Every structure is written in C-alpha cells, then in structure tokens.
Design a protein with these regions (language model features):
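DPxDG-like acidic metal-binding loop motif
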Residues: 90-119, 123, 154
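Glycine-rich, charge-dense phosphate/pyrophosphate-binding loop(s)
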Residues: 211-296
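Beta-strand segments within the central parallel beta-sheet cores of soluble alpha/beta enzyme folds
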Residues: 77-80, 114-133, 220-221
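Short beta-strand-to-loop capping motifs
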Residues: 40, 182, 259-263
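ATP-binding N-lobe of GHMP and related small-molecule kinases
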Residues: 1-88, 272, 285-296
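Alpha/beta catalytic cores of group-transfer enzymes, especially the acyltransferase/condensing modules
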Residues: 124-166
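Acyltransferase
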Residues: 171-232, 238
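Short glycine/serine- and small hydrophobic-enriched flexible loop segments
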Residues: 64-65, 101-110, 157, 208, ...
C-alpha cells in the first residue's frame, strides 16, 4: 500500500433559491472551503477527525459507500479542515460529502488501479454518491442537489433536485458577497418543512426569475419568503438593501444571510450588519468547484 495522502478542497455555497418548497433550486459556490485529507491504511477501520465540529457520521457514511461501491475492504483515515461554518445555511454538509467522496474515490482508484469512469465514478457519479451519503446521514431534506452541484462544479447551479438534473451551471463573476453569521446554528434537518411547503407558489415565481437571469431579484424574493416561514428577522436583509446591496436574503434554512454589493456600497452594508450580534464575512464567488489539491 502506497499510503498516499489525497487532499481535496470543496467550496460551500450560498442560496439563490431554496429547493425545499418546490424541489427546484439554485445556489452559487463561495470561497469558504472544506478540505478533506484521506489516507489508506491497514485493517478495516474508518477513522475520522476534524478541526471543527463536523459530523463524523457523515464522513463515515461517505467512506463506507465508496468502499462498498468499489467492493474494497481497507482502512481509511479521514481528516477535515474547514473555514466554512457548520449548520449555517452555507452548504457545509454538501461540501464535506463532496470533498470526502472525491478524495477517497481518487485514493482508492489510484491505489487499486481502477478507472473511475468504468465503475460509474466520473464527476456526475461522484456527485450523486455524495448526495446519497448526505441523505443517508440525515443532514439534508431534499439531497440538496442545488447546493451540492454548486459546491462540486463551482459557479451558479440551477437544478431540479427531485430529478437530480442540472438545468444550468455556469461561471459567475458577481459582486462582493457579504455573509452575516448570527451567534447560533440551524441544522437543515431540523427546519419546519410544512411551513416551507406553504411558500411553493411564490418560490416558483422566484425560480422563474433565476431562469431568466434575474439573480438579484430571485435571491432577494426567496430570502424574504423563507425568512417569514422560518421566523428569521427580515430586517437583516432589508437593512442591507437600504444600505445599497443589490440583493440580500436568508441562505438555505439559515441562520446565515447573504448580500451582494458593489465596491461603492460594500462598507455601508458591512457596517449595517456589524451592528447585529454575530460576525460578518466578506468573500467572492468560487468558480472552480471541488478539486484535488494534492496527492502526496
């Protein structure tokens, strides 16, 4: 056994359209990352560690599913590093699933000289395995195919989550992205699905906007709708818009809010959000997606 370390970096994503109410969604990659380091070892133990409170169950399920897919029995050591906040509405679970699934796929197919495409583990196959693992771990309601595909491929992803179909994926050079992080967590699996389903007719309107390319309108309308359903304070988004943001709203099922702003109004929006308890993060769109960064 070569005992190589395979390292993969996977970005989080922010919401344009939350898919929970209708099954169709949209998200874009952001430059906050999960890094997974995978090393094969003797035995059959799956050993998982992280520098954040990442769910080890999700990591173990990702590993187990790839090992079963390839019909390989071996020990695996997985370590996660991350500057992507967990349970925050920024697709941390999708990023972990993508990073671990890709890293272990590459490590195993290299060690055992397997062609990934011949066993159904091309990019689409890896992404689907990652989504399956997230569903099995119970960290997502719909599989979050919109979030997962934005994290995997980068840029903006528009999807039908129920069909696991990418309607459109493209690079996006958007404005500055500000993320407001309150001092609390909000796991997606604990969100009130029934209340979100009530939003379906209006979320469909927002989804049509994103299909037409009206990203700012779609993000804001979606974000305000889900604020209402999930009882988050819409003033957080409205204050950002009043300060000059071109779009603002809740990301995922919260508690994070995302705002898009040009350079001129960046400091104004940042100042407004800094008046709330919590922290504000400045980032950009990630157009690269999930990728191997080292194999050593």
């Amino acid at each position: 056994m070569k005992k190589l370390k395979t390292k993969v970096r996977s970005p989080g994503s922010a919401t344009i359209i939350n898919a929970i109410s209708t099954g169709c969604g949209s998200a874009f990659g952001i430059q906050l990352y999960v890094k997974a380091e995978v090393q094969l070892k003797q035995g059959t133990e799956i050993e998982c560690t992280s520098d954040q409170k990442v769910d080890s169950t999700l990591m173990e399920i990702c590993a187990k599913n790839i090992l079963n897919k390839l019909k390989i029995n071996t020990g695996v050591k997985i370590h996660i590093q991350s500057n992507l906040p967990v349970a925050s509405g920024l697709s941390s679970s999708s990023a972990v699933s993508n990073a671990v699934t890709m890293a272990l796929t590459y490590a195993l197919t290299d060690e055992y000289q397997i062609n990934p495409k011949e066993v159904g583990l091309d990019d689409d196959g890896i992404l689907n395995m990652a989504v399956d693992s997230s569903l099995e771990a119970g960290v997502t309601i719909t599989g979050a195919y919109d979030d997962a595909s934005a994290s995997y491929y980068g840029g903006i992803s528009i999807t039908n989550n129920l069909k696991r179909e990418i309607i459109r994926n493209e690079n996006w050079n958007g404005q500055n992205i500000l993320i407001y992080m309150p001092d609390k967590k909000s796991p997606t699996a604990e969100a009130d699905v029934a209340r979100m389903k009530l939003l379906a007719p209006w979320v469909k309107l927002a989804f049509h906007e994103v299909l037409k390319g009206n990203i700012h309108h779609a993000l804001t309308l979606n974000g305000l709708l889900y604020c209402s359903a999930l009882r988050f304070n819409p003033d957080i988004a409205l204050d950002a818009l009043e300060a000059g943001a071109v779009a603002a709203g809740l990301s995922g099922t919260g508690p994070s809010f995302v705002a898009l702003t040009d350079d001129k109004n960046l400091s104004k929006v940042e100042d407004v959000w800094n008046s709330y308890p919590g922290r504000v993060i400045l980032t950009k769109v990630d157009n690269q997606g999930t990728q191997v960064i080292a194999s050593e």
